[in-house]
Amino acid sequence: MHEVFEIRPRGNRPGFVVKAREIDYQHRTVRIVTADVDYVFLGAGSFHTTRLLVEARAKGHLPKLSGKIGDGFGANGDFLTARTGLTDDYGPVQGGPGYGRFYDDDFPGGPVSMVYHSTPLPYPTGKLLTTNLIQVFSPERGTIDYNRSTGTAELNYPFAEHTSILDRRGNSFANHFARRAGGVPIVSRLAGFGSASTYHGLGGVVINQAADLNGAVRGYDNLYVVDGAFMPGEVGLVNPSLTIAATAERTMDRFVATH
């Protein structure tokens, strides 16, 4: 496995020098590897793609990067909850997890979606609980910033649990759904539910801000982003994987067409 830790411009012609640690399964460094490349496509995941660029800018390795690098990090509106105390039989529970999604366009404050998962536990335990991923629209965005005291990038998300827009809307919908469909919503943090989650953290090198519409990172030719860092914090009440894949494919199609 390799862990990239440094990206610098190549001095004599366009391109980059990339340094990485080759590591074993205990995360011990085996050796340092250096690659001399014409193009870099960043796909380390939203946080780590952004972290590499934030640290490179702060350390002077890539000083021309946009000041918007690190901005616009969101949780995709994800809010995890569960229901128990169900009175109706909802079918077999040992073939799952079952999956379904629905949208409520009439919910106050804007539409909401919810994914239903039947818990894949043996009978009768599996009939005691269903887990649900609620997704809401939220304008709340954090930033990934360089911490000079530690020499690393870190996420700053200044929205408190329970009082954030995301948490309040998610909690409200969990109770709304339970009133309509039955059961008792579980939104306690003690049980691991009831707050925004980072299953789908998105942003940091946002489209048309820190990167252009084609995925090119502003400030440097030949540097591209092809993962969730390109997304603007949320993608509209869905799992973002297909949207990320589609924009990455679009970036590569346009790259091939112009190079």
Segments predicted by a language model, with ranges:
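A conserved FAD-binding loop/helix module that cradles the flavin
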Residues: 233-255
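Flexible loop/turn segments at secondary-structure boundaries
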Residues: 6-8, 48-50, 140-144, 194-201, ...
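Glycine-rich loop(s) and the adjacent beta-strand/alpha-helix scaffold that form part
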Residues: 3-11, 19-93, 227, 247, ...
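A short acidic-Thr-Gly-centered motif at the start of a beta-strand
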Residues: 24-34, 207-220
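FAD cofactor-binding and catalytic pocket of flavoenzymes
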Residues: 66-178, 201, 209-211, 219, ...
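Flavin (FAD/FMN) cofactor-binding core of flavoprotein oxidoreductases
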Residues: 182-205
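Active-site-adjacent "gating/activation" loops or surface patches in catalytic cores
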Residues: 10-17, 213-214, 220-221
